[in-house]
């Protein structure tokens, strides 16, 4: 669950066009096996240097670890994950996206990788999620190790979703 530390983040925000789709496929370890032009354009990467790289090359440090734990736990169960993700472009800029990530299966039903489609997110939802993620990050920073950080951050996310009376996926879909 490492973050992209080789790029210096900036305050430059990129906005996805309403009809833009960012599509990637990864193997079981999260290494990119396919990236569409939309992904390459918004992340400011080229295909040659992107394929086989870990998908976390676009991970923004403002993303709580607990969100990625939830993502991986959901996918490993064979379930579909929805999330609002702040990604980082190769120049340090960022963009918010509504992500739908699903397992990919072979003919025998075995998970062989993951398929991600991201699109522009609702601004109202981004503002809510931004505040929630900031609270989660603060909780993570107060812990002495990743395990405790994820537990503290997950509790905040769980408490928020319990207040809403729905799961994380259901909450996000309600804004779609």
Regions found by a protein language model. Give the residues of each.
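Juxtadomain coupling helices with adjacent low-complexity linkers
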Residues: 112-176
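Sensory/regulatory domains in signal-transduction proteins
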Residues: 2-137
């Amino acid at each position: 669950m490492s973050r992209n530390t080789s790029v210096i983040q900036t305050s430059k925000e990129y906005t996805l066009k309403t009809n833009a789709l960012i599509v990637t496929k990864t193997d079981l370890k999260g290494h990119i096996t396919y990236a569409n032009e939309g992904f390459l354009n918004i992340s400011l990467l080229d295909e040659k240097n992107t394929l086989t790289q870990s998908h976390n090359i676009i991970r923004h440090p403002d993303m709580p670890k607990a969100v990625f734990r939830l993502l991986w736990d959901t996918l490993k169960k064979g379930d579909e994950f929805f999330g609002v993700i702040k990604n980082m472009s190769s120049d340090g800029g960022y963009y918010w996206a509504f992500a739908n990530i699903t397992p990919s299966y072979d003919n025998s039903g075995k998970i062989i990788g993951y398929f991600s489609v991201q699109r522009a997110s609702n601004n109202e939802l981004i503002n809510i999620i931004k505040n929630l993620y900031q609270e989660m990050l603060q909780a993570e920073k107060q812990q002495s190790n990743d395990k405790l950080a994820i537990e503290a951050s997950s509790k905040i996310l769980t408490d928020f979703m319990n207040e809403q009376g729905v799961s994380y996926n259901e909450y996000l879909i309600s804004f779609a």
